[in-house]
Amino acid sequence: EKETVSAISELIEYYKGIFTILSSCASRQLEEVTFRRGIISVPELFALAEKYFRKANKGKGVAVSFSTRAIDERVVGDFIQLRFLLENLIDEALSVPLDGEIHLAAAVDGEYIRFLFTDMRRTKTREELNQLFYPNLERMMATGEKGELRGTEYLVCKQIIRDHDEFAGKRGCRINAEPAEN
């Protein structure tokens, strides 16, 4: 029993180390872009997400529709990083070859604008959704185009939110993973 506890503790430390390394990689990936705080139009951000989806989905061989519901509001943040966040969510969703619908919507939530990215093709529990933001060896062993590492999209998104917390001066920016309400 003592050996088992020791082995489990060692395994936990090992995975914490991996998580730290991957978070550092995500952070370094974002360091290449200087954080530029500005006022961003939500409809403009959504238009770019639609354009990116069309480009990323071209030739995939699955019937996936992408609908958006923007609101005429503005957010404070880094335009390039927010665009990159949406592109990462789209890339991850399109890595699953299923027909169906993906929705992107925005809504006012107190002082914040809530962005809702919903993949209607998949059903996951809250726990399964939250696990997407942690390292998963199986997801990461799959390589994408040009040999790029896959399965880190959500880690990058998490790091973008952390950067916005730090640099935009608005604490409380979060990614909440929750099942869609039908």
Question: Can you annotate each of these PLM segments?
Answer:
Residues 36-51:
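A conserved beta-strand-to-alpha-helix junction within the catalytic ATP-binding
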Residues 87-92:
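Conserved polar catalytic motif of the HATPase_c/GHKL fold
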Residues 30-40, 76:
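Short flexible loop/turn segments at helix-to-beta-strand junctions
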Residues 156-172:
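Conserved glycine-/histidine-rich ATP-lid loop and adjacent helix of the Bergerat-fold HATPase_c
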Residues 38, 63-73:
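Conserved catalytic submotifs in the C-terminal HATPase_c
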Residues 124-141:
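Short conserved segment of the HATPase_c
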Residues 8-18:
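Short alpha-helical segment of the dimerization/phosphotransfer core of two-component systems
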Residues 101-111:
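Short beta-strand/loop element within the Bergerat-fold HATPase_c
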